[in-house]
Amino acid sequence: MIAYVEGRLAEVAGNACVVVTDGGVGYEVFVPGHTLARLPDKGGRVSFFISTEVREDALELYGFATWDERQTFIVLTSISKVGAKTGLAILSQFRPDDLRRLVVEDDVLALTRVSGIGKKTAQHIFLELKYKLKVEDLPAAAPLVTGGAPGGVFRDALAGLANLGYGEEEASHVLKEVLHGEPDLDVGGALRAALRALARGR
């Protein structure tokens, strides 16, 4: 399963872009609207955390700027009646913390602002989000690693590297070095820095 793509932006079409890796492989990646708006010019470097959606007739990649956004997409698409396209539309309208606020504030009607979602569907999605979304993460980020003790960022980034196939010992060593040098990184930043370090053979 593809979980991370980094490379050169080759093309943008609709809500998708083509990313060509340093190895010369091109991937079509569907991204939220706010991510599309911040893409660099063609030839610029981009990186996405990927959720791979497999259907009978297609394999599609959905890309996100942060690990939190990717995980929120997975939560959304685990809800019945919410496919990948609807999940992407929701995340084009609301960031993960916005969705958590909707849950905390019990603002079910806000979801009807998303194209294709009526009141009945919004109520269904909202009910599922109440049980599946981690509202305790709002608004502060997870605790950082300090003094070498694994904190929330360390644990989540380590889990992300494990999902990408890295061994715990190697990933833990690199993450500790990364967070020691840059203690203010969030989970996504720590993952990207660790992946770059691992790619250099560190």
UniProtKB/Swiss-Prot annotation:
Family annotation (InterPro entries): DNA_helicase_Holl-junc_RuvA_I (IPR013849), NA-bd_OB-fold (IPR012340), RuvA (IPR000085), RuvA_2-like (IPR010994), RuvA_C (IPR011114), RuvA_C_sf (IPR036267)
Key words of the record: Cytoplasm, DNA damage, DNA recombination, DNA repair, DNA-binding
Region (Domain III): 155-202
Region (Flexible linker): 145-155
Region (Domain II) residue spans: 66-144
Compartments, as annotated in UniProt: Cytoplasm
Pfam families, A to Z: HHH_5, RuvA_C, RuvA_N
Positions of the UniProt region annotated as Domain I: 1-65
One annotated GO molecular function: ATP binding
GO biological process: DNA recombination; DNA repair
Any one of the GO CC terms: Holliday junction resolvase complex
Annotated function: The RuvA-RuvB-RuvC complex processes Holliday junction (HJ) DNA during genetic recombination and DNA repair, while the RuvA-RuvB complex plays an important role in the rescue of blocked DNA replication forks via replication fork reversal (RFR). RuvA specifically binds to HJ cruciform DNA, conferring on it an open structure. The RuvB hexamer acts as an ATP-dependent pump, pulling dsDNA into and through the RuvAB complex. HJ branch migration allows RuvC to scan DNA until it finds its consensus sequence, where it cleaves and resolves the cruciform DNA.
Domain description: Has three domains with a flexible linker between the domains II and III and assumes an 'L' shape. Domain III is highly mobile and contacts RuvB.
Family stated for the protein in its record: Belongs to the RuvA family.
Assembly behavior: Homotetramer. Forms an RuvA(8)-RuvB(12)-Holliday junction (HJ) complex. HJ DNA is sandwiched between 2 RuvA tetramers; dsDNA enters through RuvA and exits via RuvB. An RuvB hexamer assembles on each DNA strand where it exits the tetramer. Each RuvB hexamer is contacted by two RuvA subunits (via domain III) on 2 adjacent RuvB subunits; this complex drives branch migration. In the full resolvosome a probable DNA-RuvA(4)-RuvB(12)-RuvC(2) complex forms which resolves the HJ.
Entry protein name: Holliday junction branch migration complex subunit RuvA
Organism the protein comes from: Nitratidesulfovibrio vulgaris (strain DP4) (Desulfovibrio vulgaris)
Gene that encodes it: ruvA
